[in-house]
Swiss-Prot record:
Keyword terms: Cytoplasm, DNA-binding, Repeat, Transcription, Transcription regulation
Signal peptide coordinates: none
Gene Ontology CC annotations of this record: cytoplasm; nucleoid
Species this chain originates from: Dictyoglomus turgidum (strain DSM 6724 / Z-1310)
Cited SUPFAM superfamilies: AbrB/MazE/MraZ-like (SSF89447)
Listed name of the protein: Transcriptional regulator MraZ
GO biological process, alphabetically ordered: negative regulation of DNA-templated transcription initiation
């Protein structure tokens, strides 16, 4: 499981250091893709392949799934860390997530998320979190009852 929150900066070439404890779980090569809240997601090769198989198995006549496939596959790249533990983030992903300098790398369970620092701070404003937590807690409570 990926856990924790790390503050880093993108260098002028678009490279980012992946925290060592994350690299140990990811290996040298993994997938980087667009996330749903204008962040980037990192997946292990295994999880990437599993999710890709699931979304590819839906009917090609399903408009919603075609849209998801386009979003998922067109916005993804396989990356490999260099000897310093950095990855090169392509410019189209930097622009998508607005990662122009300071970033926050967070563990999100089975995947990692990379956020622009300002967007992460806005997302985590206390009133936003507290508002969402009630609804989230209700959903989790329902799962525990099963």
């Amino acid at each position: 499981m990926f856990v924790g929150e790390y503050y880093h900066s993108l260098d002028e070439k678009g490279r980012l250091i992946v925290p060592n404890n994350f690299r140990q779980l990811l290996g040298e090569t993994f997938y980087l893709t667009r996330g749903f809240e204008r962040c980037l997601n990192i997946y292990t090769i295994t999880d990437w392949n599993n999710f890709s198989e699931i979304i590819s198995s839906f009917s090609p006549t399903d408009d919603l799934m075609r849209r998801l496939c386009r979003f998922w596959f067109s916005g993804s790249v396989q990356v490999t860390t260099d000897k310093l533990g950095r990855i090169l983030i392509p410019s189209f992903l930097i622009d998508y997530a607005e990662l122009y300098k300071d970033v926050v790398i967070i563990g999100a369970g089975r995947h990692i998320e990379i956020w622009a620092k300002e967007r992460w701070e806005e997302f985590n404003k206390e009133e936003n979190i507290l508002e969402s937590m009630k609804e989230i807690n209700e959903k989790v409570s329902e799962l525990w009852k099963r």
